[in-house]
Amino acid sequence: TAAVHPGENTLTVQVYRFCSGSWLEDQDFWRMSGLFRSVELFTKPELHLEDVFVKQSFAEDFSSATVTFDCKVSGAGTVSVVFNGQEQSAEVGEPAEYDSGVVFGKGEADPDVEEDVQDVSFTFTVEHPALWSAEQPNLYEAEIALLNEGALVERTGMKVGLRKFELKDRQMLLNGKRIVFKGVNRHEWSCRTGRTVSREEMLWDVKNLKAHNVNAVRTSHYPDDPYFLQLCDEYGLYVIGETNLETHGTWQKLGADGSDEWTLPGARPEWRENVLARAEAMLERDKNHPAILIWSCGNESHGGKTLWEMSEYFRNTDPSRLVHYEGIFWNREYP
């Protein structure tokens, strides 16, 4: 990059309090500006793990689990995955197919990456899996390593919770057993530092929720800090991950004159990309957290085609979770 030079460099960040997207952020909280969470600037090697999506399926009696790591890798080299005492590897760079549960193929080029992004999947079988739940938040460890001619280039560690969540006969089932949410809405707020919440305060929240027999949290009304979700994985809290969308101020005129001209996002094409991008950003960041059982389209943003498209995006991209939306009323255009 031409943006930095040898020696010391100055990085200047300009933060805007409001932007056009602020019309989609009408949540009920104090309006503050600034950086509330950690910000990272990093470089990546030519051989790089761009993404991983952990997918699961189970025997009917949960006596075994099939766990697949769908990886996207840029560059050429060796990809190695270690999970549950098993190791699998594959060479990336040329389309091929491998035995032992490894399938490899060339994906579409990512416009944000110079190299083509290639898809490679690793499938493992776990006998008698230790399942994840709020009562027993069992976690497995996985490690993905990228090597160039045997030399380690990059290593990624992650924790994997094995669980199956479904809606069956009008009941929510986790690992085949009915569960009931005893939950709360949670805003990110500190009595001491406002919108910036420390890790110690997040841990305090989680421990106190557990101590008071709360088993579920809705991240009202935006995706929470990744560290909070990590704590929910480790301590055992069910999470409704909510998209950063609330526009109740734009449709309050409906009660006065019945007009729909102010309502956002509705079916307005100029807002579609912005709204769906928020849903995608949340899902792609948080999709491997076992604690998240439900994706939420947002809060109090009326109805319309765009919200329906968001719900369909969640269902089609991640059928392992349910989809929620709290919109005050039932939009009868979409039964």
Predicted regions and their residues:
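Aromatic- and acidic-residue-enriched carbohydrate-binding clefts of CAZyme catalytic domains
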Residues: 182-187, 195, 242-287
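Short Asp/Glu-rich motifs
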Residues: 191, 228-229, 250-252, 333-334
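Secreted/periplasmic carbohydrate-active enzymes, especially glycoside hydrolases
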Residues: 1-239, 278, 293-294, 300, ...
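Active-site neighborhood of glycoside hydrolase catalytic domains
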Residues: 234, 263-335
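Short aromatic-enriched loop/helix-cap "lid" or pocket-rim segments at secondary-structure transitions
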Residues: 24-25, 251-254, 307-310, 335
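Beta-propeller blade termini and top-face loops
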Residues: 29, 244-245, 250, 313, ...
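Hydrophobic residues in well-ordered beta-strands that form the structural core
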Residues: 239-241, 325
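Active-site-proximal loop/turn and secondary-structure-junction residues that shape catalytic pockets
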Residues: 223-224, 245-247, 300-301, 329
